[in-house]
């Protein structure tokens, strides 16, 4: 299994800054905007976006954490005892523009689970999706509103995102070649 780096820490920072500007532009500011990071790597990306939005607009945007474990459609094949983490959305999402944040968009199934989980907390005015990487291969009709980088991949490749808040070390995004017997 080999890996090839496609984004380094500076590339990730620039992508997140650009996405923050796009969020401001699309929503005519950040009034009534909230960010919700999909656990695990969506959370630090949401916090980074919030910091960038505050720098651009001078307004602190609320950030929530969403665990989708029990909403996944592959729960039965992922193992007998899923580890469920806390969801923490300490603000009312009703009537807000909620930007879901995740690291990689692939089949769309994680986003579908996140939408199901999020709507259990209320009825946002709209939900937008921000991802660091869109790798294609959609199985559901889901499209990101904000994309850091489009990275076409083959089915025998996966994207590995490393963020210092979760993984330690230096930030980076890598394409990793995997064998056909390995599942993502």
UniProtKB/Swiss-Prot annotation:
What is the name listed in the Swiss-Prot or TrEMBL entry for this protein? Bifunctional protein PyrR
Which function does this protein serve? Regulates the transcription of the pyrimidine nucleotide (pyr) operon in response to exogenous pyrimidines. Also displays a weak uracil phosphoribosyltransferase activity which is not physiologically significant.
* Pfam families found in the cross-reference section: Pribosyltran
- What NCBIfam families does the record tag this protein with? PRK05205.1-1, PRK05205.1-3, PRK05205.1-4, PRK05205.1-5
- Family classification: Belongs to the purine/pyrimidine phosphoribosyltransferase family. PyrR subfamily.
What keywords were assigned to this record? Answer: Glycosyltransferase, Transcription, Transcription regulation, Transferase
Q: Which reaction does it catalyse?
A: UMP + diphosphate = 5-phospho-alpha-D-ribose 1-diphosphate + uracil
GO terms, biological process: regulation of DNA-templated transcription
Gene for this chain: pyrR
EC number in record: 2.4.2.9
Motif PRPP-binding: where in chain: 98-110
Molecular function via GO = uracil phosphoribosyltransferase activity
Which organism is this protein's natural source? Roseiflexus castenholzii (strain DSM 13941 / HLO8)
